[in-house]
Design a protein with these regions (language model features):
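His/Asp/Glu-enriched, well-ordered alpha-helical/loop segment
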Residues: 246-253, 295-383
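Active-site gating loops and adjacent loop-to-helix segments of metal-dependent hydrolytic enzymes
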Residues: 73-104, 150, 155-165, 223-251, ...
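Divalent metal-coordination and catalytic microenvironments
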Residues: 7, 25, 31, 53, ...
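Metal-coordinating catalytic core of metallo-dependent amide/deamination hydrolases
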Residues: 130-259
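Alpha-helical scaffold segments that flank or form the walls of functional sites
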Residues: 73-144, 168-181, 436-437
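C-terminal cap of metal-dependent C-N hydrolases
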Residues: 13, 371-431, 436
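N-terminal metal-binding scaffold of metallo-dependent hydrolase/deaminase domains
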Residues: 1-43, 54
Length: 437
């Protein structure tokens, strides 16, 4: 048996926090949670992870990001979505035909995810099969768990970033065969978005998904120009979502990123099918796409998660992903005539952790029977306050101000994958740089 000691803060339900000062998580030898303890046992005959005085938080689940766009983080932010794709995204993704380049970028990406406390992902690769396998290798090596998709696109990709329909299907099957060697990273079918895939390709992916029982991820109603484009390509579809539905790709556990402009009818289709929304507020604001009606989605019973959506999103930080969702909801409040309530810190923390972890079969918060996914945060170097803060206040402060320097330990799938507990805390303001590779 093992014991993780510290100040525990987790989100067992939307809007609810459980805070346990000087608490402990009792784990079995495989890192499975046996019990959440409100008092630390005095005599414990087993391995102890002593994080006394540190926050023990759930790790983050990033439910939508583009791995090959990592080199582009922070660039092209003055362009709308479709122009940005042509000018920045497609050219950099084409470079991942070079496996040496792919290895360097993906190794850095995987390490940075763990360093920021993100342990579960649903991720887009590029259309390159071998580079996608490299990405899966690097994620698994770093300790990340989750789903990765080889992108499918047989039209509108531009120079050097487009497959034939036959090639896309053939390479998808080759990739799926190779995926059997991975333990913690699994495949997810990934038609880039409707404008990038012909009907023949979409139909083939729907058939593969049904035959092999595979999940699907894509994009939905991110940008008004994109929606109009889909309408031109599929005049038989009254709404964007139907362009997936008619090929068997609109189903339980399908992840749809964005849904910024999903109206009541489209939201109803999302809920009824069990489709999962990956809300990406940083990306949506950066590309001026809009702000998703998250409060309405939650009120209507939709399953909402969060995504960093790099490189339209500007940070891999799970904590920034959470706080950006709060900021976006506040902007929505004063621009929407209906004045929907903004997200609270407990609600946003839930969306960035528990709600995403549920996609992988986890329970609510630190639930007994789940493999541990946690991050220990050293907040001792934050500015001294005139009074002692409660654990919920410390969580709020950490979410808004923490950096990777404050992350002192990370557990993924019950494994300790990052351990800096013996190092002195690094000031958040310290300048840091690291060479790629």
């Amino acid at each position: 048996m093992k014991l993780l000691k510290g100040d525990i803060v987790h989100a067992p339900a939307l809007g609810a926090l459980e805070t346990i000062p000087d608490g402990a998580l009792l784990l079995d030898d495989d890192g499975t949670i046996c019990e959440v303890l409100h008092e630390q046992p005095q005599d414990f005959d087993g391995e102890v992870f002593d994080c006394t005085g540190k926050l023990i938080m759930q790790s983050f689940a990033d439910m939508h990001l583009h791995a090959p766009q990592f080199p582009n983080v922070g660039t092209g932010m003055d362009l709308p979505l479709l122009d940005w794709l042509k000018a920045y995204t497609f050219p950099v993704e084409a470079k991942f035909a070079d496996l040496s380049y792919a290895r360097r970028v993906y190794r850095r990406l995987a390490r940075d995810l763990i360093a920021n406390g993100t342990t579960r992902v649903c991720m887009f690769s590029s259309l390159h099969t071998d580079a996608t396998l490299v990405l899966m290798e690097e994620l698994e090596r770093a300790g990340v768990t989750g789903f990765v998709g080889k992108v499918n696109m047989d039209r509108n990709g531009g120079e050097n970033l487009q497959e034939t329909t036959e090639e896309s299907i053939r390479e998808t099957l080759r990739w799926l065969k190779e995926c059997s060697r991975f333990t913690h990273i699994k495949p997810i079918l990934t038609p880039r978005f409707t404008p990038a895939c012909t009907d023949e390709l979409m139909a083939a992916l729907g058939k593969i998904s049904a035959e092999k029982g595979l999940y699907v991820q894509s994009h939905l109603s991110e940008n008004l120009d994109e929606i109009a484009w889909v309408r031109e390509l599929h005049p038989d579809c009254a709404q964007y979502w139907e362009s997936y539905d008619k090929f068997g790709l609109w189903k339980d556990h399908t992840i749809m990123a964005h849904c910024v402009h999903s109206d009541a009818r489209e939201r109803s289709a999302i809920r009824q099918a069990g489709v999962v929304v990956a809300h990406c507020p940083d990306s949506n604001i950066n590309l001026c796409s809009g702000i998703a009606p998250v409060r309405q989605m939650l009120n209507e019973g939709l399953w909402v998660t969060l995504g960093s959506d790099i490189a339209a999103g500007s940070s891999l930080s799970g904590s920034q992903m959470v706080t950006m969702s709060i900021r976006a909801s506040k902007i929505r409040r004063f621009t929407d005539p209906e004045k929907p309530a903004f997200l609270t810190v407990p609600e946003a923390y839930y969306l960035g952790t528990t709600s995403g972890h549920r996609y992988f079969g986890a329970g609510n918060g630190f639930a007994a029977g789940d493999r541990l996914h946690a991050v220990a945060v050293d907040d001792r170097d934050f500015t001294e306050t005139p009074r002692a803060l409660s654990l919920s206040e410390r969580l709020e402060r950490a979410l808004y101000t923490m950096t990777a320097a404050n992350v002192c330990a990370v557990w993924s799938e019950g494994r300790l994958v990052l351990d800096r507990r013996t190092a002195a805390p690094v000031r958040k303001t310290a300048a840091r740089s690291r060479k790629l590779g």
